[in-house]
Amino acid sequence: MNILLVCAAGMSTSLLVSKMEKSAQEQGKDYTIWAVSGDSVQNHIDKADVLLLGPQVRYMLPQLKKLGESKGVPVDVINTVHYGTCNGAEVLKSAEQLGHVS
């Protein structure tokens, strides 16, 4: 599964990406997880199975949902508490539910 995260500058989610990768690894799952800034999404969405937005870029949801629909990629906003506490396991679970992967 390829999980693309979007944040304001592509940097604020780097710790969350690390925590998600660790959680996936502990579960024996071979996922690719990366973060980009909002203006870079179009260059990466073709490689993604799901697209998750950081709460700080929630305002981009309508625009990115349209893009996701045109590419067959489900889009949602990361739970604010899970994002704020850097809960990689819960964000990973959300991505799997969004992408219908167990």
From Swiss-Prot:
GO terms for molecular function: kinase activity; protein-N(PI)-phosphohistidine-sugar phosphotransferase activity; protein-phosphocysteine-sugar phosphotransferase activity. The active site is at 7 (phosphocysteine intermediate). Disulfide bonds: none annotated. It holds the Pfam family PTS_IIB. GO terms for cellular component: cytoplasm. Keywords: Cytoplasm, Kinase, Phosphoprotein, Phosphotransferase system, Sugar transport, Transferase, Transport. PROSITE patterns: PTS_EIIB_TYPE_3 (PS51100). GO terms for biological process: phosphoenolpyruvate-dependent sugar phosphotransferase system. Residues 1-102 form the PTS EIIB type-3 domain. The modification Phosphoserine is found at residue 37. It comes from the Bacteria. CDD domains: PTS_IIB_chitobiose_lichenan. Its EC number is 2.7.1.-. Induction: Induced by lichenan, lichenan hydrolysate and cellobiose. Subject to carbon catabolite repression. It is found in: Cytoplasm. InterPro entries: PTS_EIIB-like_sf, PTS_EIIB_2/3, PTS_EIIB_3, PTS_sugar-specific_EIIB. NCBIfam families: pts-lac (TIGR00853). The phosphoenolpyruvate-dependent sugar phosphotransferase system (sugar PTS), a major carbohydrate active -transport system, catalyzes the phosphorylation of incoming sugar substrates concomitantly with their translocation across the cell membrane. This system is involved in lichenan transport. The EIIB domain is phosphorylated by phospho-EIIA on a cysteinyl or histidyl residue, depending on the transported sugar. Then, it transfers the phosphoryl group to the sugar substrate concomitantly with the sugar uptake processed by the EIIC domain. This is Lichenan-specific phosphotransferase enzyme IIB component. It comes from Bacillus subtilis (strain 168). The lineage of its organism: Bacteria, Bacillati, Bacillota, Bacilli, Bacillales. The gene is licB.
